[in-house]
Amino acid sequence: MPNKKSAEKRVRQSEQRRQKNRGYQKRIKEISKEIDKKIHENAEREELMQLLSKSFKIIDTAKSHGAVHKNYAARKKSKLHLKVKKYLGEMAPESSPVNE
């Protein structure tokens, strides 16, 4: 137990931040699972693209609020995007080196 008022306030603030950060992290997990579910259900292209856009917004919001690290956010977005592209069969062909 904190002995000073300021220490009590810091405990309250840290608990509030923890709850908020966990909420952001929970939303990221939920949207990721929803994308996986839609892929397994053979969802339409439009539906998946809207869901992907929504997931990017959620991840960026969590990043901007400091709930997740910027590298984690970038990695998560990249993995989700690759997963959706692979499902849709839109993988870009590997570029061949230019012969000079």
UniProtKB/Swiss-Prot annotation:
GO terms for cellular component: cytosol; small ribosomal subunit. Belongs to the bacterial ribosomal protein bS20 family. The keyword Ribosomal protein applies. It comes from Petrotoga mobilis (strain DSM 10674 / SJ95). It holds the Pfam family Ribosomal_S20p. Residues 1-26 are annotated as: Disordered. Keywords: Ribonucleoprotein, Ribosomal protein, RNA-binding, rRNA-binding. Residues 1-18 have a biased composition (Basic and acidic residues). This is Small ribosomal subunit protein bS20. Binds directly to 16S ribosomal RNA. NCBIfam families: S20. One of its GO terms (biological process) is translation.
